Structure formats: structure tokens, C-alpha cells
Amino acid sequence: MINGRNFVLASLMVAAPVSAAKQALGIFSLWGAFRDGNRCWAIAEPEGASRRAGERAFASVGWGRHGERGQVSFRLARAKRQGSAVLLRIDERLFQLIGGGDNAWAENGRADAEIVAAMRTGVQMTIETRAENGASLRDTYPLRGAATAIDAAAIACART
């Protein structure tokens, strides 16, 4: 029988970038931290995430092979409507994201740092936009465990 913790680990490993060298750094509540060579990331699925193929929404904070540090990105459950704003709310703080298709991200490194700081102390974050069909698209992520997962990923990539 699969317990909640193992289900989260299995789900996040599927949502994370594919590679044979992937290493789980830990699961921290609903957030996981992973390493794949010189890439590291903290990642979570939204509450009530769909398990259907093609609808694997997630939020991640990553460190990459091209020098990215604490880069925030989101995969939406569906493609967003062209021209629709993408808003991220962390408790009472509001951030404007940019993106296209089913992806959204912070505008620059400064915005990444502000979002990560808010995630560290926040309780919940919600990303909202309009889907291509005009329907409201909203994903909510509990932030319990996010700071620890972010730290685990940052430390793992600092060692490379």
C-alpha cells in the first residue's frame, strides 16, 4: 500500500524533469527537493492536482547549469490565454508573472528573490490566469515544507 509521503514522492518525480541520474534530496510535507547532475530544484503540485496525463501542474524553485539561482517557475494545468495576466498571491503579497503556453515565471532575478522570500514565510500561494478557453485557471499550493525543500536544493547545488 502506498502512503501519502510515498505518493507525493512518486508524483513529484514524475512531474520533475526526466533523467536517469535524478536523486531525491528529501520530501518536506508536500514539497520535494531533487538533484540531477548540476541542476537542483524544490517542487510541489497544487492542492487537488489532476492525475490525468497532460495536466501535471507544479511550482518549482531551481538552480541550473546556466547559473540560475532560485529561479521560480510554474507549469499550469492548461495553456493560458494569450495576453492574460498571470498573478501570484502569497498570503497578502501579489506578484505579476510572465509566461506563455502552460508555463509562467518571474520576470527577473530580483522578482525570483522576492517571491522565494515570501514563500519562506508564507502559508499559501495561489497562481491565477485565464485558460485558452476563457475559463478561470487557479492553482493553490500550501507552503508548509517549501523553505526546507528550497534550502535542501540550494545546498545540494552549492556543492557542485
Each PLM stretch: what is its role?
Residues 11-20:
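Hydrophobic h-region of N-terminal signal peptides that target proteins for export
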